[in-house]
C-alpha cells in the first residue's frame, strides 16, 4: 500500500459535454474531424451586440438525462454537470457495485459564474412581477457550490468535497484539489466537474474586458496563435473526470492515467516578475517526476489575443526550446468554456494519449514567426505520446498546469 506522501492519484473515468460533442467519443471525433462548434448565438437576438458568436451545445435535452423533479431547481450548467457526472461515474465503473464507501466518494467542482441562466430568469421575474414570483430554488441554484451539492446528493457521495473559483484556470485547479484529497486517504475517489453555460448576460458581459472577438465569421473569429488572432469566442460546457487512489483503482481493475497538478498566481502588474504560467508548468513537471524532454505534447491555453498568445509562446519556448514540442489548442473549435475549458482540454489530452494522435488547432492559417511554436494545424498528427502538459489561464493572474502520463510514462496504451 502506498504511503500518504507517495500515494498516486489516477484518472479512471471521464465525460465531456461541449459544443460539437455531447459525450466523450462524440467530442473527441469532433476535434479530430475539425468540426466547428462556434456559431451565431441562437438563444436570443444578438444582432445589437458587437460579438454575436458562441460555442453552443445544441443537442442536450435535459429531460432525457435527468429526472423531472430536478429540472425546476437547476440551472442549465448544473444539468450539464449532473448528466456528465453520471457518464463519468459509469465510465469509471464507480457505483454501488464498486465496493467504495459513500464517505470515500467526494465531489470537487469549479465554476466562474454559478447558475447565471437561472438567476437571470428569476431576477427578471423579480423586476417585472415582484418577489412572490421568484422561485424558491433561486436560494441555491445560483450558488457557486451548487454543482458540488447536486452531484453529491444524486450519487450519495458523502466524502470530502469542495467548490473552487479560479476563473478560467479553475477547472484545472479543481483537478489539483481532488488529487491532494485523494492522496490523503486510501480508497478515496473524487468526481471533478467544471461546466459553464453561455447566456445572454454571461456572454455579453465579457465584452467589457476587451478580449472577446468581434469578428462575425465563425471560421475566423477565434484563432489562437494565428497572425489574424483578434480575441476569443466564449463557449459553454465542460468535462467531468473521476480521480481515484491508484491502489483502489488497481484493486478493481480500472484503467489508469496519472495526473499531477499545481497552480500559481501571476505577480502583481508592474512588479517586473515574469508571468507565473511557466512556473506552474515547471512545478507540474517536477511533481510528476518528469523533465521537459519527457513531454510529448502541450495542450495550450490559446487565448486568441495576440499579446497573451505571445506570452504563452515565449513561456513554451523557454521551457522546451524553440519549436521543441508539438502544441495544440483544440478549444479553437469550441470556444473558451471558462472554468470548463481546462478539464475539456485535459479530457482531450487523455484521449490523445489513448489513441496516440494529436488533434489539430482548428481553422489555423499561419503562426507568427516570433512565436517559435510547433503548432499542430490542418489535420491531426499521429505521434508516440507518453505524457501531455495541459495549461489554463484566467483573468487577474490565475494559472494552472496539469501533467498526465500514460500508465506512468511507459508508452503503452491502456487496455
Curated annotation (Swiss-Prot):
Keywords: Acyltransferase, Antibiotic biosynthesis, Transferase. It comes from the Bacteria. Residues 6-406 form the Ketosynthase family 3 (KS3) domain. Its EC number is 2.3.1.-. Pfam families: ketoacyl-synt, Ketoacyl-synt_C. InterPro entries: Beta-ketoacyl_synthase, Ketoacyl_synth_C, Ketoacyl_synth_N, PKS_Beta-ketoAc_synthase_dom, Thiolase-like. Pathway: Antibiotic biosynthesis; granaticin biosynthesis. It is an enzyme of class 2 (transferase). One of its GO terms (biological process) is fatty acid biosynthetic process. GO terms for molecular function: 3-oxoacyl-[acyl-carrier-protein] synthase activity. SUPFAM superfamilies: Thiolase-like (SSF53901). Gene3D superfamilies: 3.40.47.10. This putative ketoacyl synthase lacks the active site cysteine. Belongs to the thiolase-like superfamily. Beta-ketoacyl-ACP synthases family. This is Granaticin polyketide putative beta-ketoacyl synthase 2. It comes from Streptomyces violaceoruber. The gene is gra-orf2.
Amino acid at each position: 500500500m502506498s504511503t500518504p506522501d507517495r500515494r498516486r492519484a489516477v484518472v479512471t473515468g471521464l465525460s465531456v459535454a461541449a459544443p460539437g460533442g455531447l459525450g466523450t467519443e462524440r467530442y473527441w471525433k469532433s476535434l479530430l474531424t475539425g468540426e466547428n462548434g462556434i456559431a451565431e448565438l441562437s438563444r436570443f437576438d444578438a444582432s445589437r451586440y458587437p460579438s454575436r458568436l458562441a460555442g453552443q451545445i445544441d443537442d442536450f435535452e435535459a429531460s432525457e438525462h435527468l429526472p423531472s423533479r430536478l429540472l425546476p431547481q437547476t440551472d442549465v450548467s448544473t444539468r450539464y454537470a449532473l448528466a456528465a457526472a453520471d457518464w463519468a461515474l459509469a465510465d469509471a465503473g464507480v457505483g454501488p457495485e464498486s465496493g467504495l464507501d459513500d464517505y470515500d466518494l467526494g465531489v470537487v467542482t469549479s465554476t466562474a459564474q454559478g447558475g447565471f441562466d437561472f438567476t437571470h430568469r428569476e431576477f427578471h421575474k423579480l423586476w417585472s412581477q415582484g418577489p412572490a414570483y421568484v422561485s424558491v430554488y433561486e436560494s441555491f441554484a445560483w450558488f457557486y457550490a451548487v454543482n458540488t451539492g447536486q452531484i453529491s446528493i444524486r450519487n450519495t457521495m458523502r466524502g470530502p468535497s469542495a467548490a473552487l473559483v479560479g476563473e478560467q484556470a479553475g477547472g484545472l485547479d479543481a483537478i489539483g484539489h481532488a488529487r491532494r484529497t485523494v492522496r490523503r486517504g486510501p480508497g478515496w475517489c473524487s468526481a471533478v466537474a467544471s461546466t459553464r453555460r453561455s447566456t445572454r448576460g454571461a456572454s455579453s458581459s465579457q465584452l467589457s474586458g476587451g478580449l472577446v472577438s468581434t469578428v462575425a465569421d465563425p471560421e475566423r473569429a477565434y484563432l489562437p496563435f494565428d497572425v489574424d488572432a483578434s480575441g476569443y469566442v466564449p463557449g459553454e460546457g465542460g468535462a467531468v473526470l473521476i480521480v481515484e487512489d491508484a491502489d483502489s483503482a488497481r484493486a478493481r481493475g480500472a484503467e489508469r492515467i496519472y495526473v499531477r497538478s499545481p497552480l500559481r498566481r501571476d505577480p502583481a502588474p508592474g512588479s517586473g516578475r515574469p508571468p507565473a504560467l511557466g512556473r506552474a508548468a515547471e512545478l507540474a513537471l517536477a511533481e510528476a517526476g518528469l523533465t521537459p524532454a519527457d513531454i510529448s505534447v502541450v495542450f495550450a491555453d490559446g487565448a486568441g489575443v495576440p499579446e497573451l498568445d505571445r506570452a504563452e509562446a515565449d513561456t513554451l519556448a523557454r521551457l522546451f526550446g524553440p519549436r521543441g514540442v508539438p502544441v495544440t489548442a483544440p478549444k479553437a473549435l469550441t470556444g473558451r468554456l471558462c472554468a470548463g475549458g481546462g478539464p475539456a482540454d485535459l479530457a482531450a489530452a487523455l484521449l490523445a494519449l489513448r489513441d496516440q494522435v494529436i488533434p489539430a488547432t482548428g481553422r489555423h492559417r499561419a503562426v507568427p514567426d516570433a512565436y517559435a511554436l510547433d503548432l499542430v494545424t490542418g489535420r491531426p498528427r499521429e505521434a508516440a505520446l507518453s505524457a501531455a502538459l495541459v495549461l489554463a489561464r484566467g483573468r487577474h493572474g490565475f494559472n494552472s498546469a496539469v501533467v498526465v502520463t500514460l500508465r506512468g510514462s511507459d508508452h503503452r496504451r491502456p487496455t
